């Protein structure tokens, strides 16, 4: 189901899981990393100036191969954290006095990809 992620024109911080969200889950274990549908396009649609952070449970030994895979796709990533715990990711942030909600959670099914998620910058927020 298509979904618009409606955001303010302020700069944003993106925290994205890697395996199962952007690339096929556990593909790196067989040497076959594969971008999921819409993942590269979604990453390229993130506004310039925003901070992009990837989280992965991959072991440190997979760092260079993973970073090379990301570079080869020509997407901009600012930081990648390896050996992140596999449990839930919790983000806690306030709501601005104007009512602007400063945290969003998007939880696609594993290996679904992001082709149905669109970033919309709303100048009225």
Predicted features by range, described:
Residues 1-125:
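HAD-like aspartate-dependent phosphatase fold
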């Amino acid at each position: 189901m298509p979904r618009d992620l409606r955001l303010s024109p302020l700069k944003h911080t993106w925290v994205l899981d890697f395996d199962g969200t952007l690339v096929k889950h556990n593909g790196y274990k067989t040497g076959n990393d594969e971008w999921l549908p819409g993942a590269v396009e979604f990453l390229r649609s993130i506004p310039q100036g925003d901070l992009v952070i990837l989280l992965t449970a991959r072991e440190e030994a997979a760092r260079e191969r993973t970073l090379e895979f990301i570079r080869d796709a020509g997407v901009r990533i600012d930081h990648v954290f390896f050996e992140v715990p596999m449990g839930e990711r919790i983000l806690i942030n306030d709501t601005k006095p104007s009512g602007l909600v400063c945290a969003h959670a998007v939880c696609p099914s594993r290996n679904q990809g992001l082709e149905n998620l669109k970033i919309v910058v709303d100048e009225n927020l």
